[in-house]
């Protein structure tokens, strides 16, 4: 049974939206699950109005489908969807790393080093949720170092799609071991102001992830969908 816990700092409709979104992104509410307003309002102890508004927002995000007769349900995310995301990430993340290497402060360098080190330590005690949390934190912090709100908004949506895919498919912990080394290389290039290398390392990181997803598609026998 799903456990919903709403924090009180934000408007109720925003809290409902964020809670449902989190559960979809982390796979707690699985693909194809129907989202019943009555059921959700009872579980979350709220009226149907914020539930309805949240479902509409999630549909705008592409996380929920709304169809006549069938109603609202959680959208699928396929290997092809993820490869499409990586096509975007290939250009964006290289630029992000390049810009971060030019703008990062001394304090931010220390924090980025800390996050990369925490990730490296986390993979020694495989905990999927913790590893994914630190992976997301690493990439988000590099964006923060760019001090560019427009760029932050652009990449936020792309990273959210990646987050959902991680929870659904990333069960091979050997993949995370190689990712840790890539994070260290990116971090060092950014911290040392090696702009071209920062971009190259970030590009290589995304290409490695894209290859991992492509090979995963082969294993799942969905290769026709990704070519």
Label for each model-derived stretch:
Residues 1-102, 144, 150, 210, ...:
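Short linear motifs at protein or domain termini
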Residues 18, 76-121, 129-143, 156, ...:
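Amphipathic alpha-helical segments that line or abut small-molecule/effector binding pockets
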Residues 32-33, 67, 131-132, 151-155, ...:
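Short, hydrophobic secondary-structure boundary micro-motifs
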Residues 56-66, 126-130, 134, 201:
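An N-terminal domain-start capping segment
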Residues 78-79, 165-169:
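Short alpha-helical transmembrane interface motifs in multi-pass membrane proteins
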């Amino acid at each position: 049974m799903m456990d919903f816990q709403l924090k009180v700092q934000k408007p109720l409709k925003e809290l409902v939206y964020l809670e449902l979104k989190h559960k979809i992104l982390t796979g707690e509410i699985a693909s194809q699950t129907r989202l019943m307003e009555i059921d959700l309002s009872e579980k979350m102890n709220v009226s149907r109005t914020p539930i309805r508004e949240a479902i509409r927002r999630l549909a705008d995000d592409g996380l929920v489908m709304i169809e006549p007769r069938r109603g609202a349900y959680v959208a699928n995310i396929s290997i092809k969807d993820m490869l499409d995301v990586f096509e975007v990430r290939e250009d964006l993340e290289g630029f992000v790393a390049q810009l971060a290497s030019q703008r990062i402060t001394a304090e931010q360098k220390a924090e980025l080093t800390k996050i990369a080190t925490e990730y490296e330590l986390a993979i020694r005690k495989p905990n999927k949720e913790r590893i994914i949390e630190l992976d997301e934190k690493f990439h988000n912090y590099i964006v923060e170092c760019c001090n560019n709100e427009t760029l932050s908004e652009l990449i936020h949506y792309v990273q959210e799609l990646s987050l959902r895919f991680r929870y659904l498919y990333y069960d091979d912990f050997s993949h995370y071991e190689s990712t840790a080394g890539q994070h260290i290389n990116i971090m060092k290039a950014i911290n040392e102001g090696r702009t071209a290398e920062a971009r190259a390392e970030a590009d290589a990181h995304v290409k490695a992830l894209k290859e991992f997803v492509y090979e995963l598609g082969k294993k799942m026998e969905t290769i026709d969908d990704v070519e």
